[in-house]
Amino acid sequence: MPELPEVEVTRLGIAPHLEGRKVSAVKIIDGRLRWPVPANLTKTLPGQTVNGIERRGKYLLLEMDTGYLLIHLGMTGTLRVLPSSDPLKTHDRVTLEFGKLSLRLHDPRKFGAVLWHPKSKGPIKKFILLQKLGVEPFSSEFSGELGAEILYQTSRKRSVAVKQFLLAGQAVVGVGNIYCSESLFEAGIHPAKAAGKLTRPQCSRLAKAVRSILKKAIEAGGSSLKDFVNSDGDPGHFMVQTKVYDRKGLPCKVCKTPISQMVQGQRTTYFCSQCQKR
């Protein structure tokens, strides 16, 4: 599933091509995604300009003249900017036309989303799917020891494992399964440790690790396990840098202990039992 780094890589790839351009047409090839694609987009969007492209968590937010187009890549979605003359591919679901350019959502499993939030309904932060998201890891709110304090305060009295606490995204957004395992390893925290038992020093190390790992992942173009490619069609390369993820039985890159694997909440977790003592 594309997580924050993959979505940010996508944003960085499409923004230079689309910002300032006017939509000439919208084609809904198959609108049966996680939620139905609003049919009226074919009438609402043409003539509107893309004034900016932001990211909130795993959502891309295209600011148009009268509202925001929200795009979620789901499990296997990708966005690419292509010449409008290129033929559609199987699993292309929605296209936004910009004259000779086309933005295409390719989503084989149809778990993605294309939604619309009119500005007349208030700021985009009031959109129901964005209301409960935690802070952005690269925002000023999460910088320095502010991030540590957010993790410490939101984890109090929480018996859930720290990995699942991070995955929930209510403290800080974007720390998906791969990046949870890597961040917890870098911080030296066992993934099954109860979130409520995290100390302030541990929260400080974890906040720093989250920012560091996500930054490295973005610089590497994200992670490509099966389907993810960037807006140019290239895979991400973060997987070659992982220290624990998908390395079961291989020696830890720090202490040489074989990497362990367990399942938490139906998600596979990787860790070093020596570097991350419970």
UniProtKB/Swiss-Prot annotation:
CDD domains: EcFpg-like_N (cd08966)
GO biological-process terms attached to the record: base-excision repair
Cofactor: Zn(2+)
Active site: 2 (schiff-base intermediate with dna), 3 (proton donor), 58 (proton donor), 267 (proton donor)
Cofactor note: Binds 1 zinc ion per subunit.
Residues holding DNA: 91, 109, 158
Catalysed transformations (reactions): Hydrolysis of DNA containing ring-opened 7-methylguanine residues, releasing 2,6-diamino-4-hydroxy-5-(N-methyl)formamidopyrimidine; 2'-deoxyribonucleotide-(2'-deoxyribose 5'-phosphate)-2'-deoxyribonucleotide-DNA = a 3'-end 2'-deoxyribonucleotide-(2,3-dehydro-2,3-deoxyribose 5'-phosphate)-DNA + a 5'-end 5'-phospho-2'-deoxyribonucleoside-DNA + H(+)
InterPro entries linked: DNA_glyclase/AP_lyase_DNA-bd (IPR015886), DNA_glyclase_Znf_dom_DNA_BS (IPR015887), Formamido-pyr_DNA_Glyclase (IPR020629), FPG_cat (IPR012319), MutM-like_N-ter (IPR035937), Ribosomal_uS13-like_H2TH (IPR010979), Znf_DNA_glyclase/AP_lyase (IPR000214), Znf_FPG/IleRS (IPR010663)
Keywords annotated in UniProt: DNA damage, DNA repair, DNA-binding, Glycosidase, Hydrolase, Lyase, Metal-binding, Multifunctional enzyme, Zinc, Zinc-finger
SUPFAM superfamilies per the UniProt record, alphabetical: Glucocorticoid receptor-like (DNA-binding domain), N-terminal domain of MutM-like DNA repair proteins, S13-like H2TH domain
Entry GO MF terms: 8-oxo-7,8-dihydroguanine DNA N-glycosylase activity; class I DNA-(apurinic or apyrimidinic site) endonuclease activity; damaged DNA binding; zinc ion binding
EC number: 3.2.2.23, 4.2.99.18
ZnF endpoints (FPG-type): 243-277
Pfam families in UniProt: Fapy_DNA_glyco, H2TH, zf-FPG_IleRS
Signal peptide extent: none
Role description: Involved in base excision repair of DNA damaged by oxidation or by mutagenic agents. Acts as a DNA glycosylase that recognizes and removes damaged bases. Has a preference for oxidized purines, such as 7,8-dihydro-8-oxoguanine (8-oxoG). Has AP (apurinic/apyrimidinic) lyase activity and introduces nicks in the DNA strand. Cleaves the DNA backbone by beta-delta elimination to generate a single-strand break at the site of the removed base with both 3'- and 5'-phosphates.
Family under the similarity heading: Belongs to the FPG family.
Subunit structure, as described in the record: Monomer.
Name of the protein in question: Formamidopyrimidine-DNA glycosylase
Gene for this chain: mutM
